[in-house]
Amino acid sequence: DLDKITTAIVAEALVQSPSFAVTWAVQTGIGSLPIIWFGTDEQKNKYLPKVSSGEFVCAYGLTEPSSGSDATQAKTSAKLTEDKKHYILNGEKVFITNGGIADVFVVFAQVDGNKFSAFILEKGTEGFSIGREENKLGMKGSSTAQLIFQDAKVPAENLLYKVGKGATIAFNCLNIGRFKLGCSCLGGSKQAITTASQYALDRKAFGSSISKFDAIQKKIAEMAILTFATDSMIYRTIGLLQDEIDLIDKDTPDYYIQMGEAMGKYAIETSMVKVFGSDCSHWVIDQGLQVLAGYGYLEEYSLAPAYRDDRINQIWEGTNEINRQIITGFMMKKALTEELPFRDAIRNIDSFLNEGPSSDNSEFGKEFDSVETAKKLGLYLFNES
């Protein structure tokens, strides 16, 4: 097994081919992780060898026409037959990456109307069909299609984990998906900086390279600063997560379930990575395109397709607006349960506000004080709200 740090590096590098990166991310992430983490031995033995070899392509069916980020309100239904041998699925999924090319689908549905659950479906299942390919703004090399269930007949043994445990599966897998998305965005930001910097060095105006103009230097410097912050956030987070995973006994029967649950402990951080990383790449690519000026608007130059491809990153894996709510919601929940030591930190706010930071003359002392002050002010506002 690759460690999670290597996964982050690979996700960052694959942005050189964005549409393939999306296909790969689903194949190695949300499309297969539900089976890896929560599948039975029989399910793993049946599907994972062909998934890992590439013989089977995976897809993940969560979003519906009337439920996006509020996924647990899905309308797709699953009813167990009287002989208890099959579940009958009815409903529709939309915006499904790899939908038109997949062989194996992890699909979520309501059992008995309110028990959100996950199932493994195979291409060709009776009553299961694939809708048309969507005509998208970007990521044109990837497949995005509808999934349609009309009395789709799914073997009962294809239920994943337990009835009613769909949210556990969906959101633990989305946590790693959000993180990997942030890594891809980091790669896109770095690529935009490289493209803009090289163009600025080569482009001449008013008798000199435009890289000597203050306005261009400021743009590239700010692009680099924001990208560096994203890089630091990503690799700090994945280091913490890897440390958590390393504590799990690999010989325990529920090793992968524990790994999935470990991701849940970092739901705040993975949402932060997703939001900050995608906001960063959106801004950095936009600024890079501005450096290229008119040439940046031409499809034959790399930043025009990058601009289109990047736009989806603020939407999928939960919109950035929803992820901001997730961040705040989990912080409040962990504060109330004292999983995060907010109460102890709040008690120290008054003395900090009265006395200020305890500065020293060490390297980065002032910078450290600035960060600590920002933390305390954020905590103060969080408590007052």
Task: Write out the residue ranges for each language-model feature.
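A short, Trp-centered hydrophobic/proline-enriched beta-strand micro-motif
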Residues: 54-62
